[in-house]
Amino acid sequence: MRSFLLLVTLTAALAVSAPAQIPFDNNRNQGVGVTVGLASGAGISYQEILPSALGYRAAVLAWKTGDSSFFDIGVSGLRVLSDDGRRRVYLLASMAWWRRSGEKAEVAFDDEGNLISERVFDDVDDSGAIGAGAGVELPLGPSAAISLEAAFTYWTDSGDLIPAPQASLHWLF
């Protein structure tokens, strides 16, 4: 909770200190990288900021090993509040969906410990999240940036509203 409050405070401080707006910058309106977040999803991501100060980000991650598989897809809508040419402060709305699957074996034994039956079944877990919050994009060099976000997230697994940090690392072009 402390790190979440720190991120909100940092975002608010940067929003106050970065009121200048610059014209749309074609050299930093798109980004490819990685995103990690409960509401935004996790994985390889693409981000684009449009001339209207609206933007979007999509993330996808998938893997399969043996009988197990995992799939995650997330999308975020962004509204830029402030952009001084180096950093952006924005609002975001995100949603993500995960699916984990695998096979489990259920065995039954008699009183003497002998195997009497074995049943294999699919074990599937779906969950989703939807969230809204604020973020800041900070430069890491001439063509790289890190985004730090704080989002209040509703998670379907628990039914709770969770204050969750999110982060992205993007190469801008």
Protein language model features and the residues they cover:
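Gram-negative (and chloroplast) outer-membrane scaffold detector with strong preference
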Residues: 47-148, 166-171
